[in-house]
Amino acid sequence: GTYAVANALPGEYPLVKDIKAKVYGAGKGNLADESRIGSVYWNRGLGAAVMWIEGLRNAQKMHNKVGKAVNGAEFRDGYEAINMTEARLNELGVGGMLAPFAISCANHEGAGKFAVMQWDGSKFNQVTGWEAPLDPAFIRGLVESSAAKFAKENNITPKKC
């Protein structure tokens, strides 16, 4: 079968190898089936963690709170300043696992790209590069329409960017 992924590809990326060695190698991991480390599902969680930590780092730098807690508004500022270039992804040890992306006040969607993987009977293999959707304006319209409906139903005033 095939699988389109929009967030993380499976594999033994440098950060995955470091976690295996330093966490699981030291007996501190809690995953019962360690063969799942580096799987598409495990790497989805790792990709999310990388993004949240990058947002936190940004927030701490922006608000002169390095090493200290930030509040929700400060974290949002840091999240909206995420710029995961190919160079930054490589520096973090996840180059190739995620498509490069940037977040802003007006765009929390990320890369907006996907890759197709195919199952070979034992594992998924990437069979395309990171591809853009055929009609990003249509998708953006769906996102904005859904967000406006949610805001109205929940009496939320959307933030102006």
Residue ranges and their predicted role:
Residues 140-161:
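Short, surface-exposed secondary-structure junctions/capping segments
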Residues 105-111, 136-147:
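A short, hydrophobic/aromatic-rich structural module that often spans a beta strand
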Residues 33-42, 53-128, 133, 156-160:
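Segments of small-molecule ligand-sensing domains
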Residues 1-49, 131-135, 145-146, 157-158:
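Extracellular/periplasmic periplasmic-binding protein-like sensory domains
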